[in-house]
């Protein structure tokens, strides 16, 4: 039958590779339209073409438990059991992120603990977004590094129960794995080393002689607190700079401003002056008034002639 595992396939974790998927989900995959139309007669070479057509990641969805194409291709790879080199090329493929995700899931299902850590941990540096279809049939966004973290730490991914994975520190103690160094730690080490080099360069530089002279001059001069007048001038200086050239007019306009006062104010001042002069020198004022009212000799002659004519 078309749903049987190939004859030369090796057992994985002591069982048939297809049995890594639960029976209910496996039967749903066999009955799906995608399995019958797209996965029939596929080989290891043709699976690559189908994997390149994937648009999202997911397990089953809906009330009828419909499988996604991603899960169907996973079961097909468990059925035909491609070579390890092909799976490694799937994982190292940087052009198609869904091909990489498919290879990572297959490696997690069939590979040893050492192979899983060796080939999947470098994918932590892949921050590309992938679409994931949940059980309700809705799509969500996820990054590739999140998907890899789920494969290494969770028990179920894409509705498939993952085999038990040995802890990493156990493999490190038995020297089967080297301690993991993340890319972030490497970047931090590079930054720290560059900062230390810059500090050493700054310490090695001698200050310029002008800087020394300036320091000696500052030490010789006694420090004084600025006078209030100096403070005012400094505080007013930016205002003066900001004034327009029209406001910087010289003193003559100010004099014109004093001259152009109201006539009423000028008259009041003249009256005050007259009043003061009256109070200080009354005799002088009277003589002045008498002089102003005394008739001139020509006027006296005219008045005398008029009086004669009247008498005549």
Swiss-Prot record:
Q: Which InterPro entries match?
A: PRP38
Superkingdom of the source?
A: Eukaryota
Region (N-terminal protein interaction domain), start-end ranges: 1-179
- Keyword field contains Nucleus: yes
Subcellular localization(s) per the UniProt record = Nucleus
* The UniProt record lists the keyword Nucleus: yes
List every stretch annotated Disordered.
Answer: 180-312
Give residue spans, biased composition: Basic and acidic residues: 202-223
Where primarily located? Answer: nucleus
- What GO cellular component is one of the record's annotations? U2-type precatalytic spliceosome
Q: Where is the composition biased (Acidic residues)?
A: 184-201
One biological-process term from Gene Ontology? mRNA splicing, via spliceosome
Spell out the Basic residues composition-biased ranges: 224-294, 301-312
Per UniProt, which keywords does this protein have? Answer: mRNA processing, mRNA splicing, Nucleus, Spliceosome
Q: Which family does it belong to?
A: Belongs to the PRP38 family.
Function statement:
Involved in pre-mRNA splicing as a component of the spliceosome.
Q: How does it assemble?
A: Component of the spliceosome B complex.
Put simply, this protein is called: Pre-mRNA-splicing factor 38A
Organism this protein belongs to:
Xenopus laevis (African clawed frog)
């Amino acid at each position: 039958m078309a749903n049987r595992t190939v004859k030369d396939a090796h057992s994985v974790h002591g069982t048939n590779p297809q049995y890594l998927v639960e029976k209910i989900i496996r039967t749903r995959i066999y009955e799906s339209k995608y399995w019958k139309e797209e996965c029939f007669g596929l080989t290891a070479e043709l699976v690559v073409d189908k994997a390149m057509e994937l648009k999202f990641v997911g397990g089953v969805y809906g009330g009828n438990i419909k499988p996604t194409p991603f899960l169907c291709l996973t079961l097909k790879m468990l059925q035909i059991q491609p070579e390890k080199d092909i799976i490694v090329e799937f994982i190292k493929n940087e052009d198609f992120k869904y091909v990489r995700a498919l290879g990572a899931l297959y490696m997690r299902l069939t590979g040893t603990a050492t192979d899983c850590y060796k080939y999947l941990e470098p994918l932590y540096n892949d921050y590309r977004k992938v679409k994931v279809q949940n059980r309700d049939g809705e799509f969500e966004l996820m990054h590739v590094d999140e998907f890899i973290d789920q494969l290494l730490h969770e028990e179920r991914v894409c509705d498939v129960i993952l085999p038990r994975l040995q802890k990493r520190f156990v493999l490190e103690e038995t020297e089967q794995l080297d301690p993991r160094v993340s890319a972030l730690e490497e970047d931090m080490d590079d930054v720290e080393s560059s900062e230390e080099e810059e500090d050493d360069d700054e310490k090695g530089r001698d200050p310029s002689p002008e800087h020394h002279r300036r320091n000696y001059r500052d030490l010789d001069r006694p420090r004084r607190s600025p006078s209030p007048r100096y403070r005012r001038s400094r505080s007013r200086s930016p205002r003066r700079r900001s004034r327009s050239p029209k406001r910087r007019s010289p003193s003559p306009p100010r004099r014109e401003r004093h001259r152009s006062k109201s006539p009423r104010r000028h008259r009041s001042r003249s009256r005050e002056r007259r009043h003061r002069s009256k109070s200080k020198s009354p005799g002088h004022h009277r003589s002045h008034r008498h002089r102003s009212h005394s008739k001139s000799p020509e006027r006296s002659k005219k008045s005398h002639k008029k009086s004669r004519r009247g008498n005549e």
